[in-house]
Structure formats: structure tokens, C-alpha cells
Regions:
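Duplex nucleic acid-engaging cores and interfaces of nucleic-acid transaction enzymes
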Residues: 36, 52-55, 62, 66-320, ...
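Structured, non-catalytic alpha/beta "coupling" segments that mediate domain-domain communication
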Residues: 76, 90, 100-104, 228-243, ...
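Long, highly charged, low-complexity intrinsically disordered interaction regions
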Residues: 3-6, 58, 64-82, 92, ...
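Generic start-of-chain signal for non-secretory N-termini
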Residues: 1-22, 29
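Short, ordered loop/turn segments at secondary-structure junctions
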Residues: 40-42, 131, 241, 323, ...
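A glycine-rich phosphate-binding loop feature that marks nucleotide/adenosyl-phosphate handling sites
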Residues: 182-190, 321-325, 380-381, 405-412, ...
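Single-stranded RNA-binding regions, centering on S1/OB-family and related RNA-binding modules
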Residues: 549-550, 554-721
Length: 721
């Protein structure tokens, strides 16, 4: 396949123009990153976004792998002297790696099989005789007599050996496998049965006597079934009409009446049962798992993206609480800039005396430091801690509220090398409380310090391919960090290393330079950082912000290469470069700017319209944090209990997690309520993430309460918007 053909195929698959694909591939080849291309090369790519660019990259890699595999297969078949025009055409037409493997199967070197042993015994000519289906050929027994030997002592052995060769040949027919694959995907059913007693089955009891068409099984069910099978609790099989498929194979391989009909029928049945069906079952099971894992990874990535985009509670003094029963609740107060001001351990669930002492101490700590928000981790003893805090606020008339924070990964961070470096004087348990406070103060800055897999906002995350999961989540972190941008003078190395063009080493060099030379005054200072050259500067500069520096445009996402253009646009509205620092002048500019003026400005300034629009947006809202467009976590002063709930009442809460079957909503109880996908919306949708995202604030009606099991059913369909 030529490069031009490959580009055309990618464009067709993604529904974009070949020129866009070509431009994106050229930019990749020049070493440009996806965030940089998406933000600053819109004219070149026709405004392709990050998702489209990543699809181009992945599809191109697939097409290259496909072309490489085709060449390997072609060379192998040629070396065997079996290459022909039909194979050449079929291989050229193959669009999937599976199609290539089907074509290669008859020529692929094999392990020792029944068929290979029969060939070694010299029975291939007898198999050819049967396959010829000569109506006037000798009887099978007579034909077999010529092949008797020490290895083949009887006529029955000879016929069976030849039949084994035929069975293998039939199993390698690409046309039948292709047709059968389509049939199985449309008609086959996945069935389960219990392998243990019902009282030992646990959640797998749901899948006792389970049967569903493979084309309809949702991904979370596939992963649940796989888990049950791995735990030896379920027996899983693919149920399909084998007799009909054997008849189809017989129709394909028996082309005319001959003395060998029964041998061919028996060989076809053996081929299907022993070779084809098990192979197809493995293939379909593997493909179902691959699709389910991809869906699970996509859901995790979508949830993670919205968690990272949660707005910060900037400028607030926050008390972080890491709840616990036996070892007590760890507390840490952080300043408006995230510095640790105070910390301690309190026993909120022990004796009344200890609870009273803890209440007095915590109330004093809150007043002493002017705490405005309390962040409570949602792990063990979270509900009990929430009850304590709610009572504390009311009893001591404290002027603060509390919020429940997702503490997943806090313990991982607190024991990490990074935590020891950042908080060397604090015990590992106190570091967890600091992290819980910081992840509310600035979720993005804190969560990037943790392996995203540990954040736990997915479904069956431990059952999927961990390498693929890590790659997908790392892409999300990188995408969000660059979308938001970071403060060059306060960002940690953990945050900086996700900026386009930067690595852990260059991020460390930036922080070292900052520590030695003081705050960066402008983006050009980056070129003084060791091992940060012009190419890296081009990639990263637009995503790094400097507040109160010498260049006002450094606090925007305008790239330095477009500063001249930005100044011309400001001049068009009557502002000089220096006036861009004046808040009053900027307010006047904001009122003057009209986004529909972009086409005329682009024409008069000889620039691309997408870049003009981006600059106008930045001049309207310089220094804006894009996370402000998203809802902040819900804060509370009072706690709910099951006894407070009534069917039909409406509650307000925060979406904790979105999965294939619905969304879990925290509205102040010990366990979150479930909005099943059937209760999410009156309008049709493909996936729950089309309706809600992790971190969203929603209202829902209580439709069921199971006090014994602690389950609450919610509906968003019945709530008036």
C-alpha cells in the first residue's frame, strides 16, 4: 500500500479530508505534540481536535502494521513457492489484520498436529484423491491400500490420516471462516452456568443460567463474566447452531457426488468441532473482551477528565480530614497557597470524652487559622466523620462548610518518593490529610501526582489491560493539563512534566532554575533553562502562564509566535501593548470585542480565522481559568441519614462515578445512590456519559430505599429541569 493510499484510507475511515490527514502526519513527523497541533496549528489541519489527531495517529500506526504484516506474509508464501495472482489480489484487498491471518493460515508453519503426522506418513496424495471427488475414482478402501506401511498398518488408519489432512485444510478456508465469523457475531449466544454452590457465588449468582446474544452483551457484563470465569465460579461457553454450520461447510467442500462423500462429510464435521469452532470461540471471546476493555478504559478516561477539570477552591484555607476508626482521624490545615499550617490526630468515633476533646481542639484549630472549608476523605469512617463535622459546625457556630473529597490514591501518594520530597517532616498518615485538602483546593495540581489508575473512577479497572489503561489515562492527564495551562512560577515538576514538549527532566530543570533565579519574568526566560531549546520552547510556551510578568500576553494562551498579531488586534480596538496590563482598559476592550468580527480581521491582517478567534477570546478574558466553566463540588453544613429519606423527595448531590449501567450520586449518605441508565433521561442517549459526568451537580428523585442493603435508587427523569 502506498503512502497516498494509506492516507486516503485513514481519511475515509475518519470522515475527514486526505489533506487534513497529510498535514497532521507531516506535523507529527516534525516532532510536534498533539496538544500543540490542536491549539496552534488549526489552519494547517483544518481545526482538527485532539481526539481526531489521536485517531489519525493510531490509524496510521495500524495501517503501517497492516502493510508490514502483509509484506511478511507475502514473502513467507513466496519462499514456499505458493504465491499466485489470486493470493496477491486477496492480500491487497485485506483491510483487517484478521483477514491477513486468515489468508496466511494454510501456509503458516504449524506445530505437530494430526494432519502433519499424516503428511509425514505419506498420506497427502490419498487426501488429494478424496478431495478430487472423482465420480469414477476407486473406492476409499481400495485407494488406501497403496498407502499402507509400518506407520500406517491398516486401511482405516490410512483413511483416518487422510481425513485429518482434509479437516485441517477445511479449517483453513478463509472464505468459510469469514462467513462463519459474520454468522457467529449475529447469532451466537454467550451462556453461563454456576460452578459453585449458590451461597458461594456472591455477585456471580446473577449469571446462573445466563444466556445472551454476543452482539447485545454490554461491556460491563462481559468483564463481570470474565471475572466469574477466572474465579472458577462460572462456566462460560459459546452456544451456536453447530449442525447448521457443519452443513454449510459440507456444501462448500463437497461439489459433486463421489465415492468419498461420507469421508468428506466426516472430515468437515471433525474440522468444525475440533478445529474451527474452538478457534472461533476463542477469537470471539477475545474480541468481546477487547471491546469491553476498551469501553471500560474509555469510561474511566472520561470520568478522570471531568475530575481533573473540577474548579479549584482557590484562595481558601482548607482543613483536610483523612477519616479512620482505630487509628483516629488525621487532620491538616493548608494555607491559600497549599502550605501546611497545622496538623494533628483526633479521635472522633471513640469515647465521649475523646470526642469532646477532639471537638474543642478542632474548633480551636479552625478558628485559629481561619479555615473556610473542610475537606473530608470518602474512605473508611467518612460518614461518621461527616456526622461529627456537621455537629461541630453547628455546636461551635463555625463559619465554614464541608465537602466530601474522593480520597482514592491519597495513601499511594503519601507513601511515594514525591510526597517524602514535598513533605519530608510529616508522618505518612498526615501527608494523606494534606493531599485530601489540596485536591479540593486545586484538584488538577494534586491529582497529577498520583498514578491515575489509583483514582478509581471506572468499572472493572483491575480486570482490563493495565498497559492500555495507563496509556489512555496518561493521555487524559496530558490533555487536561495543557487545556487548562499551568502557572510557570508555582507549578510542581509533577504538573510541568505533562506540558507539551516537556519531560520529567526538563520539568525538574525548570523548577531548579526557578529556585535559583527567582520567578520567571516572561516566557522568553525559559530559553535560559538548561536543555530547553527552541524546539521545546515552541511546543510548551503557550501552555505556561506568568502572572504579573513583564509581558501581559504571557498570562494568556496566546503563543509567543502570535504576539505581534495579538498586538495588531488590540491596536485595532485602540489599545497599545502596555495598556494590556491595565484592568480598566481590558474591561473596555472586552466590551468592544465582537467574535463575529474574526473573518474581517483575518482578511485585513492576513492571518487564519481560527487563530484570530482564539486571540480574541483570550483578549476578552485574559488569565481566565477554563475550569471555572465546570461545577464546583457541592459543599454542605448538615448530614443526612436513611431516616430522612422519603420516596418521591428530591435530593441534590455530586456524581461520583459514571459507568455503563448508570451513575452513582453522593448526596450526603454513607453510600451513594444509583441512577440506573433507564432513569437518567427522557431523551435517547448512547451512553450515560452523554447525560452526566463525574463531578456534575445533579438533582434526582428518590424512587427506592432498601435500608437493609443500604441501597438507594434515584431517577433524574422525573425531576423538572
Amino acid at each position: 500500500m502506498t503512502e497516498e493510499t494509506m492516507i486516503a484510507e485513514i481519511a475515509r475511515t475518519l470522515g475527514i479530508r486526505p489533506a487534513q490527514v497529510q498535514s497532521a502526519l507531516s506535523l507529527f513527523a516534525q516532532g510536534n505534540t498533539i496538544p500543540f497541533i490542536a491549539r496552534y496549528r488549526k489552519e494547517a489541519t483544518g481545526t482538527l481536535d485532539e481526539v481526531q489527531l489521536r485517531c489519525i495517529q493510531e490509524q496510521y500506526e495500524y495501517e503501517q502494521a497492516l502493510a508490514s504484516r502483509k509484506e511478511t506474509v507475502r514473502q513467507s508464501i513466496m519462499d514456499q513457492g505458493c504465491w499466485n495472482d489470486d493470493l496477491a489480489r486477496s492480500l491487497e484487498a485485506a483491510r483487517q489484520l484478521q483477514d491477513v491471518e486468515d489468508l496466511y493460515l494454510p501456509y503458516k508453519p504449524k506445530k505437530r498436529t494430526k494432519a502433519s503426522m499424516a503428511r509425514d506418513a505419506g498420506l497427502e496424495p490419498l487426501a488429494d484423491c478424496f478431495a478430487s471427488q472423482d465420480p469414477k475414482g476407486p473406492a476409499p478402501e481400495d485407494a488406501a491400500l497403496a498407502f499402507l506401511s509400518d506407520d500406517v498398518p491398516t486401511v482405516e488408519d490410512a483413511i483416518q490420516g487422510a481425513a485429518n489432512i482434509l479437516a485441517e485444510r477445511f479449517s483453513e478456508r478463509a472464505d468459510f471462516r469469514r462467513h462463519l465469523r459474520r454468522e457467529l457475531w449475529q447469532q451466537a449466544r454467550l451462556t453461563c452456568s454456576l460452578q459453585v454452590e449458590e451461597d458461594q457465588a456472591g455477585p456471580m449468582l446473577t449469571y446462573a443460567d445466563f444466556s445472551e446474544r454476543v452482539a447485545r452483551i454490554p461491556s460491563y457484563r462481559i468483564l463481570a463474566i470474565n471475572r466469574g470465569e477466572n474465579e472458577k465460579k462460572l462456566k462460560v461457553t459459546l452456544k451456536e447452531p453447530a449442525d447448521r454450520h457443519i452443513a454449510m461447510l459440507c456444501q462448500l467442500v463437497i461439489t459433486r457426488p463421489s465415492p468419498y462423500d461420507q469421508i468428506l462429510r466426516d472430515a468437515a464435521a471433525d474440522s468444525y468441532k475440533r478445529l474451527i469452532s474452538p478457534q472461533m470461540e476463542r477469537e470471539i471471546r477475545n474480541e468481546l473482551t477487547a471491546q469491553a476493555e476498551k469501553q471500560a478504559i474509555d469510561v474511566f478516561a472520561e470520568n478522570l477528565r471531568h475530575l481533573l477539570l473540577q474548579p479549584p477552591f482557590a484562595g481558601q484555607i482548607i482543613l483536610g480530614l483523612d477519616p479512620g476508626f482505630r487509628t483516629g482521624c488525621k487532620a491538616a490545615v493548608i494555607s491559600a497557597t497549599g502550605q501546611v499550617l497545622d496538623y494533628g490526630t483526633y479521635y472522633l468515633t471513640h469515647s465521649e470524652q475523646q470526642k469532646h476533646q477532639s471537638a474543642v481542639s478542632l474548633a480551636n484549630m479552625i478558628r485559629r487559622h481561619g479555615v473556610t472549608l473542610i475537606s473530608i476523605g470518602n474512605g473508611t469512617a467518612s460518614y461518621e466523620t461527616e456526622q461529627f463535622v456537621s455537629h461541630l459546625i453547628e455546636a461551635y457556630h463555625l463559619k465554614c462548610r464541608y465537602v466530601i473529597a474522593n480520597e482514592a490514591g491519597a495513601s499511594v501518594y503519601s507513601a511515594s518518593d514525591l510526597a517524602r520530597e514535598e513533605l519530608p517532616d510529616l508522618d505518612v498518615t498526615i501527608r494523606g490529610a494534606v493531599s485530601i485538602a489540596r485536591r479540593i483546593q486545586d484538584p488538577l495540581a494534586e491529582l497529577v501526582k498520583i498514578d491515575p489508575r489509583a483514582i478509581g473512577v471506572g468499572q472493572y479497572q483491575h480486570d482490563v489491560n493495565q498497559k492500555a489503561l495507563s496509556a489512555a489515562l496518561d493521555q487524559v492527564v496530558t490533555s487536561v493539563v495543557n487545556y487548562v495551562g499551568v502557572d510557570l512560577n508555582t507549578a510542581s515538576p509533577a504538573l510541568l512534566q505533562h506540558i507539551a514538549g516537556l519531560t520529567a527532566a526538563t520539568a525538574g530543570n525548570i523548577v531548579a532554575y526557578r529556585n535559583e533565579n527567582g520567578p520567571f519574568q516572561n516566557r522568553q526566560d525559559l530559553l535560559n533553562v538548561p536543555r530547553l531549546g527552541p524546539a521545546t520552547f515552541t511546543q510548551c510556551a503557550g501552555f505556561l502562564r506568568i502572572k504579573d510578568g513583564t509581558e501581559p500576553l504571557d498570562n494568556t494562551s496566546v503563543h509567543p509566535e502570535s504576539y505581534g498579531l495579538a498586538e495588531k488586534i488590540a491596536g485595532h480596538y485602540g489599545l497599545s501593548h502596555d495598556e494590556l496590563k491595565d484592568p480598566e482598559k481590558l474591561a473596555i476592550l472586552r466590551d468592544k470585542i465582537q467574535m463575529n468580527a474574526a473573518p474581517k480581521l483575518a482578511a485585513s491582517l492576513g492571518a487564519g480565522e481560527p487563530t484570530i478567534k482564539d486571540i480574541l477570546e483570550e483578549l476578552r478574558k485574559p488569565g481566565r481559568d477554563v475550569r471555572s466553566d465546570f461545577p464546583k463540588p457541592l459543599t454542605r453544613r448538615h448530614v443526612l441519614s436513611l431516616s430522612d429519606l422519603q420516596i418521591g423527595s428530591v435530593v441534590r448531590g455530586t456524581v461520583q462515578n459514571v459507568v455503563d449501567f448508570g451513575a452513582f450520586v453522593d448526596f450526603g449518605l454513607k453510600t451513594p445512590g444509583l441512577v440506573h441508565r433507564s432513569q437518567l433521561s427522557r431523551h435517547p442517549f448512547r451512553h450515560p456519559t452523554d447525560v452526566v459526568h463525574a463531578g456534575d451537580i445533579v438533582e434526582a428523585e428518590i424512587i427506592s430505599v432498601d435500608a437493609a442493603r443500604g441501597r438507594i435508587g434515584l431517577s433524574m427523569k422525573k425531576v423538572k429541569k
